[in-house]
């Protein structure tokens, strides 16, 4: 069966870059590596005492800290899968690095404005990346969209914390 032909009789150029076929081994290795990096980062943060202040009033919808850590591990597994599935791997690595930096700009500065700005930039990048890779790998786009959804939740949580405890700027 022949492909579509243009007026010149040649196939039109492909605009969408397609990723190379993904083997199970590469998929598993990238997932394991990203989860390991996230787990090591979470462990280091816990060992260094990077915990939110206990004096804050938390909104009723805030999940326990352990749940947040588990969700991030699952999200990093999804980003690892997206890294293996998407053709634009550098862009996925940038998202992974932005998410690894998340605890540092949220807790290190203890500043609601910094948290919001970081969330907005990370959210905008995640949405852009999901839209960019959606034709390369719809599954990778779904994994990245899950990160964006969680960042929306985190942003709502930051706004609620600021409202309940006063803005720290």
Residue ranges and their predicted role:
Residues 156-169:
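Juxtamembrane boundary at the C-terminal end of a transmembrane helix
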Residues 48-61, 166-169:
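Membrane-interface helix termini and inter-helical loops of multi-pass transporters
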Residues 16-45:
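N-terminal signal-anchor transmembrane alpha helix
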Residues 72-83, 94-100, 122-123:
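Core segments of transmembrane alpha-helices
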Residues 58-71:
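Short aromatic-rich membrane-water interface segments that cap or initiate transmembrane helices
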Residues 104-116, 135, 164:
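Membrane-interface helix caps and helix-loop-helix hairpins in membrane proteins
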Residues 2-24:
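Short, Lys/Arg-rich, polar N-terminal cytosolic tail immediately upstream
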Residues 35-43, 95-105, 148-156:
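Aromatic-anchored segments of alpha-helical transmembrane domains
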